Amino acid sequence: MAYRDQPLGELALSIPRASALFRKYNMDYCCGGKQTLARAAARKELDVEVIEAELAKLAEQPIEKDWRSAPLAEIIDHIIVRYHDRHREQLPELILQATKVERVHADKPSVPKGLTKYLTMLHEELSSHMMKEEQILFPMIKQGMGSQAMGPISVMESEHDEAGELLEVIKHTTNNVTPPPEACTTWKAMYNGINELIDDLMDHISLENNVLFPRALAGE
């Protein structure tokens, strides 16, 4: 099957572990989920046939849950428990670890200088963003008023873009989240946590941008 003309966001939702494959190739399937696989591969100078072959292999596995057809209220409840609550746990812990690593290893050239600041910015932005979704947008959608929510949804999508840009800064600061040979246990644990956060946040944004918001605007 030819995947090259399909949007990244659609592929990430319909093929098991496609999101992990896109992450490996540093392809943006959440904020950039509307671009086709062919366009995304061309921008990264990647061989689209190789990626299509890998996707075909992944597509042989059954998908755990197809959120594209789930009720909107169920999607919202899942987003809050699986992503919002998880981000509220992840970020304070990562900020503590980054503070320690930047302090203890300040004299090392490989120290991720500024990481604490960027994680704190992400924490503040996401805390405000998730609260607005939970208090304003999600109740509107649950009440069947999603088609009238173009304004709030536009704001949320813009904030998703800002979060995506911060993730890129964090990846740059951490050498693409790769610990140096001299990294201590806390440093390595922190990078594992950052990788988990990036995966979670990209899946979270993808589910909202590519499923929840379009279906809500369509009047479901």
UniProtKB/Swiss-Prot annotation:
Q: Does the keyword Iron apply?
A: yes
Its GO CC terms are: cytoplasm
Where does this chain mainly localize?
A: cytoplasm
Q: Which UniProt keywords apply?
A: Cytoplasm, Iron, Metal-binding, Stress response
As recorded in UniProt, coiled-coil segments are none
Q: Name one GO molecular function term.
A: metal ion binding
InterPro entries annotated for this entry?
FeS-repair_YftE, Hemerythrin-like, RIC_family
> From its record, what is one biological process in GO terms?
protein repair
**Where's it found, cell-wise?**
Cytoplasm
What this protein is reported to do is described as: Di-iron-containing protein involved in the repair of iron-sulfur clusters damaged by oxidative and nitrosative stress conditions.
Family under the similarity heading:
Belongs to the RIC family. YtfE subfamily.
Q: Matching PANTHER family, A to Z?
A: IRON-SULFUR CLUSTER REPAIR PROTEIN YTFE
Q: How does it assemble?
A: Homodimer.
What is the protein name given in its UniProt record? Iron-sulfur cluster repair protein YtfE
